[in-house]
Amino acid sequence: MASQFQAYFKLTKFRLTSTVAFSSGMGYILAERGQVDWLNLVLFLIGGFSITVSANIINQIIERESDKLMKRTASRPLPEGIITVQQAIITSALFLIAGTVILAVYSTLNALILSLISLVIYSFIYTPLKTVSPIAVFIGAFPGAFPPMIGWIAVTGEYGWEPGVLFAIQFLWQFPHFWAIAWVLDEEYKKAGIKLLPTKDGRSKHTATIIMTYTLCLLPLGFLPYLFGMSGITSAYIALACGILFFFQTMYLWKECSVKAALLLMFGSFLYLPIVQIAFVLDKIY
């Protein structure tokens, strides 16, 4: 029973799903003009979390055969046969229904629609495209950048420049983030036929130059929340400082072209986004 529970827990990709929920929560708090309705926020996060779990399970169903080929993913519940495809489909459907109902009641229609669009793009377009072309990273960056936008729209019910700003920052951040991961796991990905690095040169200065360019473009975006009155100037400078450090890591990758440098960049990307988003929120509140 315990091992079965652990398998289902693993199926949810809890850490990944939690980061998605976190960024949507940041968007939600930034959109609130008065006192945050914490109960509604928690319920919104549960709804979004559930839909994200559903998408992650669909992803694992589709990739169950290729997951067997990689050491990092071979121990997932589906490749190991601990959970059957039928059980995974039922679990995904239950999470999807639960998330849809919760968001329908405690969110807005536009936030619900965008959440479902995100699931479709991630599960049925990005996932199979990973073995076809590196353009999968571009496609996957859309659902990857929707969470803070969904959080904002869950409060306001409307699209606009402000949620677009949150989307733009997270959208551009994903390129160095995913390419750093793809660099580290390049040999594993090749076994499974996954193509995510932006050039055919693989781990090369050409690839590192592209990663540097995208990271450089991210630097000025940190000032947009301040310019649109979403947050203060302090957080803009924090975002700039984090962006510069992030860029220095890409320079190190260009110089070394090593897995070690890519690992540092990967961990740097993990830190960049939550630090910047927390800075925006705290600067708005205080």
From Swiss-Prot:
One cellular component (GO) term of this entry: plasma membrane
Bilayer disposition of the protein: Multi-pass membrane protein
Catalytic activity from the UniProt record: heme b + (2E,6E)-farnesyl diphosphate + H2O = Fe(II)-heme o + diphosphate
Disulfide links within the chain: none
Top-level taxon: Bacteria
Transmembrane segments: 14-31, 38-58, 94-114, 135-155, 165-185, 207-227, 228-248, 262-282
Pathway named in the protein's UniProt entry: Porphyrin-containing compound metabolism; heme O biosynthesis; heme O from protoheme: step 1/1
GO biological process: heme A biosynthetic process; heme O biosynthetic process
Signal peptide extent: none
Gene3D superfamilies cross-referenced by the UniProt entry: UbiA prenyltransferase
Entry EC number(s): 2.5.1.141
Localisation per UniProt entry: Cell inner membrane
Additional comment: Carbon 2 of the heme B porphyrin ring is defined according to the Fischer nomenclature.
Cross-referenced HAMAP family: CyoE_CtaB
The protein, known as: Protoheme IX farnesyltransferase
Gene designation per UniProt: ctaB
